[in-house]
Each structure stands twice: as structure tokens, then as C-alpha cells.
Amino acid sequence: MAKYFTSESVSAGHPDKIADQIADAILDAVLEQDPKARSAVEVTTSTGDVSIFGELSTNAYVNIRKIATDTIREIGYNHAELGFTADSVNVSNKIVEQSGDIAQAVDNAEDDPDQLGAGDQGMVFGYATNETDSYLPLTLALSHRLMRKIRDARENEILPYLRPDAKGEVTVELDDNDKVKRIAAVVLSTQHDDEVTLEQLRADIRKHVIDEVLPQDLVDEDTIYYINPSGRFVLGGPQADSGLTGRKIIVDTYGGAAHHGGGAFSGKDATKVDRSAAYYARYVAKNMVAAGVADKLELQVSYAIGVARPVSLNVDSFGTAKVSEEKINEIITKLFDFRPLAIINNLNLRRPIYKQTAAFGHFGRTDIDLPWESLDKVKEIKNLL
């Protein structure tokens, strides 16, 4: 029986991703003035409306409405026919200050007063695979590339009739060793102007987007292409569907190839281990795989609120390790510090670097420079093997 695996991605103009980008744009603006600000901003989007709420503790002053409308405009919602535009949207701001109880627990770790405690309990996962140069599953890497390509086709007016909302999905067939054998199917749905015919859109998307992204040695005559399979897709974005921060956590991470602890990223400052520890776990997994420790590796790290040191750390190499599990744990324990303040300092996370991550994935990015994607520990790991 054939074995398949699928991942998806969405465009920057997807309603949930609009919300994520606004939340991280607010975070970045605050961090520019106040690197130690605490943020847990949430955003909803709907027809003609953006609601911003959550918690923010900072000495900075930022223009929330302007940040939201500038972000919407940058994404491409700037024409009245889209039903959701930067110039007409209503922005409501209901942000409040962070709970004092949470603040004191974070500022004074129970197990180490000189360290920050975790901002909440919970578990995070980090993952890497040598399946691609980006150390992401091929299905997710290709899905993200499809979404970036369709954005470029719209912004560069190669396909000027495209609108900002889009989704993509790639399915591969695997061999008996779980290696990619071929691309079995591609699904791509994109919003478009009313005038374009479905026939033209499908031909253009195949030529200018899909065929320019997919590795031709992995497609064959049996590869299936579903381009706008629902047909008409004129109404899209928040005019058609409401959006909310944190609803694309699998798109943001590993495309379903690894576990997820449930915590979202956007709008959260680095004291929130949902974000910072997940980034650090990716950093560890990527460096370990790049050093040849295993073909793929997943870390689970768990925390207690107000406590600096992790409650637990578990490693799974899926049977691909080149050394013993004991050796892997020994290397990780020796080289990597999972306490929140150590993570913040090691990755320099008190900077306005987050908005750029809020679309097209937080990991495996080759178009932007992210500290948790650095391979600066590979040499040290190899020296310990």
C-alpha cells in the first residue's frame, strides 16, 4: 500500500495570517522602544474590522491603529472591491496591562532568583530533518515556496488579477524507508479578480507558479494538480472568513511532521516559552541534524510557570540516530541552556525581528536571517561525537 504525507501553507493575505502579522508588527514597534516589554497581543479580523486585545506591559508608546493599517496595506488590501482595506477598516484596541501575579513569577524564578522564570507552564517541540537544505520536510518547504511565488506573481504584476488570499498544499509519496519518492499531488487555491476565467487562471498558475517551484525530477505523469478546485474565488480574506492569531500553528512550524505543544507564536515576547523555547528547540535540533547526529530529530521541552529550568527534556531520533540516545542527551545537556533568560540572551530575542516571521513560516527561512536558524553549534557538536 502506498504511503503519503501532506503539508500546507497559506499566504500573507490569509485572514489568520493578517492577524498574526498585525500582532507581531505591534510587538516589533514596542520592542524598538522597550526591549524588555512584555507582550501577549491577540488580533481578530473580519469584514471591515480589526479587533486588538490581550496584555501589554511597556513604557513605549506606539500608534496601534497606524501599525494595523500599515500592515494591512503592505499585505495588499488596498482596493475597495476587496471588502477589507487599510483605509476603511475599523480598528478597536482593547489591550490591557499584564497581570502583576504573572509578572512577579517571571521576574523572580523560584529555582534561580537571578534568572527569569518561564512565563507559563507547557511543552514545546523542536524538529529538524535533513530531507531538505532548510532542514524542513519537503512538503512544507514546497508549500511555503508556492505561497511566496504566488505573492511575487501578484506584487510584480506577472499575474495582476490575483488577490492577496491563497492557500497551498503538497502531497508526496514515500518509499519503504520514508524517503520522498515523488510528488503525488499539489493543491493551490488563490483569490482573483472577477474578470479572469478559471481556464486562464489554472493555466497561468501552473506555468508561472507551480512549475517554477516543484522539482521536476519529483513530478511525473501521475502527479495531480488541483488549482482552484472549488472554482470561483473572488471573495476572500476577512471579507469571506474571519481571522485570528494563532490558528496556523502547523503552518508556522513543521507542517505536521512533528508534534506541537499547542502554543502559538505571534504577539508574544520572548519571556513566553511558547515562542522562545520553541525557537531554541528548533535551533538545537537543526544543529544536531546538521552535525550528522541523526537524519531527523525532535525535542520536547516542558516548563513550569515561574521556574527557570525545564521540568523535562525528551529526544526522539525516529530510529535515525548515528550515535546512542545517551550520547545525544549528553551533548545537548553540555552545549545548550534551556532557561528562558539564557535563551533570550543566546538568540538575542529582545529585538524587533518578529513581524517577518508571521507569514511563510518561522523555520527554515532562507530569505531572512533568523538567529534560531544559525548553524553555529555544528563544529562544537562534532567535536563531542
Curated annotation (Swiss-Prot):
The gene is metK. Residues 98-108 are annotated as: Flexible loop. One of its GO terms (molecular function) is magnesium ion binding. It is found in: Cytoplasm. Homotetramer; dimer of dimers. Belongs to the AdoMet synthase family. Binds 2 divalent ions per subunit. K(+) binds at E42. It comes from the Bacteria. One of its GO terms (biological process) is one-carbon metabolic process. Its EC number is 2.5.1.6. This is S-adenosylmethionine synthase. ATP binds at H14, D165, A166, K167, R232, F233, D241, R247, K248, A264, K268.
